[in-house]
Amino acid sequence: MNAPDKFAQLLALTREPFPASTKNYLIGSRPDVRVPVRDIALTNGEQVSVYDTSGPYTDPAAEIDVRRGLPSVRGAWIEGRGDTERYEGRQRVALDDGSKSEDAARLAQLRAEAAALQRAPLRAKSGASHTGNVTQMHYAKKGIVTPEMEYVALRENGRREWMAQYQQDAAREQRLAGNPMGASIPKIITPEFVRDEVARGRAIIPANINHPEVEPMAIGRTFKVKINANIGNSAVTSSIEEEVEKLVWAIRWGADNVMDLSTGKNIHTTRDWIVRNSPVPIGTVPIYQALEKVGGIAEDLTWEIFRDTLVEQAEQGVDYFTIHAGVRLAFIHLTAQRRTGIVSRGGSIMAKWCMAHHRESFLYEHFEDICDIMKQYDVSFSLGDGLRPGCASDANDEAQFAELRTLGELTRTAWKHDVQTMIEGPGHVPMHMIQANMTEQLRTCHEAPFYTLGPLTIDIAPGYDHIASAIGAAMIGWMGTAMLCYVTPKEHLGLPDRDDVKQGIIAYKIAAHAADVAKGHPGARARDDALSQARFDFRWQDQFNLGLDPETAQQYHDETLPKDSAKVAHFCSMCGPKFCSMKITQEVREFAAQGMQEKAREFRGTGGELYVPIQPA
């Protein structure tokens, strides 16, 4: 079976809309600003609207051919600004797909299958009348509100009308008000607010001009907490088809961003398929591909090879690069006494290069050159934490914080070039040390968005690290982290498959939502209230459909009560019909109401007098 047929087979599994859900769009000030929402119809006639990351894949009206890529969302906006130009781009070479790529015939076949995914790249115009800079931060600093910023504002607000009935009790709202931990979160996100946050560097909108298919989103602590899912092949396993399916599967369950961390065969061609078919921003770690180009020998890396890789990926449309420029020669000795040393792949690659040449990292030395590339395409920095702790006992040590201080310095440099920047964080941190991480990051990195891997709070949960890390993720998300990188059950054990991806995303959607509720993000709790009401009313189907994973919720319910009659029963298999606390509560309320009615009848029977003479015994 050829690759396109395989793609069609796989993607057919993920195009079904969610139960009782309809894809709708909020329209902005121009007709091509169309922001997706998922409307959930409840059995009592109400409708709940939720943030949607699934792109056109869950829209039955959308025609999708993964061999050609998704339709453009931003093409007209980019062209309308008049500050970009198409050009031929760099010439592809066999080494772009890695030194271990398929044989020449198979590679030619793979590239032929991806022919319709190729685009002539765009870059910023330069010269007397142009700045050579097309970043959202550049526009924001000039006071320009772009369509991308308006799109973000509409997306963050979503539909609010349905929430009103759950927010009418002022005393309850006051009692449940969140603590934003110093963030200034407005009740309504306006396009001007988005512009201001981007201009200040407190938020980014990752959106390469060569990724017009992306639906703009914001990463910043005044916005909803976002989650990132990692996909990508390895030298051991996986195929292009599987990775594209993981992408579509990940965004179905709520991934706001996806990183392609491929380190195996066909890296460039795999990325063609992923970027062209992704409605969410795509990130990469360019040093991985650069290392493949030198046969996996870190000391053979050069600035020239790395620079060429940056341009290659920017032309393809990658939205953000993880760059481990904070791993400096002077910091490497600080990891010598660690229990697990350097656990970042990119960090270890650069540490080995620095030691082999006994000189400063070429990423650090050429950082301004990197900025010059980024601003031509609007690629955002994700400044990598190459010295992050790999176990709880290494948390918050000098190596970690020395690198963090350097990332703060590099953030200032990036902002000088108007390059959007976020900061990567740990890792493995016990619960009582998480606040110190957030405080230090805000202080040293000037409130640039923080993007953390968890952190894992304990180290004894192989197979369950998605839970161990979601605990830390919820905490640090509340404290100010803007994006959480998911962890799957396979963390530390192997390459995640489709089911692992789903489990990791659901765990992190829970963490992100818990953080939004704790921060008091406007409307965050309304979906919880709607589900709680459905639970109290024994509207089982609504309970399933309002959850993060309707399929699993219904599956668990139906394992013991599979009949349709159980969907209207006022009990579940946990308590049965006699011991359901909610059913008993409803009965108590009914008894109380009946008692009040009886007393009212008794009052009227006495003539409606407030004071009735006591009859002698």
UniProtKB/Swiss-Prot annotation:
EC numbers: 4.1.99.17
Catalysed reactions, semicolon-separated: 5-amino-1-(5-phospho-beta-D-ribosyl)imidazole + S-adenosyl-L-methionine = 4-amino-2-methyl-5-(phosphooxymethyl)pyrimidine + CO + 5'-deoxyadenosine + formate + L-methionine + 3 H(+)
The keyword Metal-binding appears for this protein: yes
Pathway linked to the protein: Cofactor biosynthesis; thiamine diphosphate biosynthesis
One Pfam entry name: ThiC-associated
Enzyme class, UniProt record, top EC level: lyase
Binding-site positions, Zn(2+): H428, H492
Quaternary structure, from the entry: Homodimer.
Function according to Swiss-Prot or TrEMBL: Catalyzes the synthesis of the hydroxymethylpyrimidine phosphate (HMP-P) moiety of thiamine from aminoimidazole ribotide (AIR) in a radical S-adenosyl-L-methionine (SAM)-dependent reaction.
Entries under NCBIfam families matching the protein: PRK09284.1, PRK13352.1, thiC
Homology family: Belongs to the ThiC family.
Protein name: Phosphomethylpyrimidine synthase
Lineage, top ranks: Bacteria, Pseudomonadati, Pseudomonadota, Betaproteobacteria, Burkholderiales
Gene, per the UniProt record: thiC
